[in-house]
A protein has these predicted regions:
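Intrinsically disordered, low-complexity polar regions and short flexible loop motifs
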Residues: 1-328
């Protein structure tokens, strides 16, 4: 029925021919919308909406948030009411958060602290309230879309808040020095190809869930055997994770690292060090030429990461020393 937004449907990436028909009708007798070809890339989340009145019905395609802000909620507003004018969105009686939003556009996501919000819709540039949005509760680390839908002409205009898909950010590092270039597969599909030693991918944003990961020599068929895997890894919504191939090829080991979201330092920078050299001893990380007790990170062993530490901004020369060793 009108006003319904489905749950996300998980489908393989690719091109899909979409048709919308009256309930119970045969597509061969004619579609309300379509057939239309839509491309959905792997690892993305998309909303497809039917808008406008029946005579002028059209399909709108929205790219949903790739990743929510970790310490706030993330919200966008979507104007899908074809006969409604351009509008401003504001807290009850307050200054507008969003201005001059017109059909069929959507805003960028804006970050808001979690909590309860009373919002109102006003004609663009006016303080007059056209519609009071029922109280919305936002949770930190979650992305939301607020859809303005329906028609002013038949009084079907309403607002539909919705939670966007939970998304995880994952990046992959090849840190096994004697392993060949590799391809990385997730749930049977290649996500990275011909990855050399020392490479760290950008974050890949994927729907939260469990993924079966396999790493094979570049160009090889996973059916012929994997360098790593198959192994099932869980990625929760709103998280960032680094998955690294470490150790020598004969004992290659995947390591998962939780990439915590941290607020940037007011002054300076924040740095984390991860020890992923399997045959290296425990180490200290220190400014070049500094004393033993001036090490920034101490006694770091293989597979261990030290939390983000504030350091001065600018170029810094660092030494890696055996744990407890003096500068040479």
């Amino acid at each position: 029925p009108f006003g319904v937004l489905s749950e996300y449907l998980e489908v393989p990436g690719g091109t899909y021919t979409i048709e919308v028909v009256a309930a119970g009708a045969d597509p061969a007798d004619g579609a309300v919308i379509g057939p239309v070809d839509l491309d959905f890339a792997s690892g993305t989340t998309t909303t497809v909406a039917a808008t406008n009145n029946l005579e002028n019905i059209e399909a709108q395609v929205l790219d949903d948030a790739p990743m929510p802000a970790g310490d706030t909620a993330q919200v966008r507003v979507v104007h899908f009411s074809a006969d409604a004018p351009a509008v401003d969105i504001a807290p009850d009686g307050g200054d507008a958060l969003i201005t001059d939003l017109s059909y069929p556009n959507d805003t960028d996501y804006i970050n808001l602290p979690g909590g309860k919000y009373d919002l109102e819709i006003r004609p663009a540039g006016s303080m007059d309230v056209a519609f009071d949005i029922p109280e919305i509760t936002l949770t930190d680390g979650v992305s939301y879309s607020v859809f303005a839908i329906g028609s002013l002409a038949d009084d079907s205009f309403t607002v539909l808040p919705a939670v966007d898909a939970a998304v995880a950010g994952v990046r992959v590092g090849h840190f096994s020095a004697d392993a060949p270039n590799v391809d990385v597969y997730a749930n049977g599909g290649a996500i990275l190809e011909d990855v050399p030693f020392g490479a760290l991918s950008d974050y890949l944003f994927v729907p939260a869930g469990t993924y079966t990961i396999e790493v094979v020599a570049a160009g090889a068929d996973p059916a012929d055997g994997a360098v790593i895997g198959p192994v099932d890894l869980d990625f929760d919504g709103g998280t960032l994770t680094t998955v690294a191939a470490t150790n020598e090829l004969a004992e290659i080991t995947p390591v998962e690292i939780n990439d915590k979201r941290v607020k940037p330092a007011a002054e300076g920078a924040k740095v984390r060090v991860v020890h992923l050299s399997a045959n290296a001893p425990k180490v200290d990380i220190a400014p070049d030429g500094s004393k033993r007790n001036e090490a920034i990170f101490k006694n770091l062993k293989f597979g261990q990461s030290k939390g983000y530490t504030k350091v001065p901004a600018g170029e810094v020369d660092l030494d890696i020393r055996a744990a407890g060793e003096r500068a040479k």
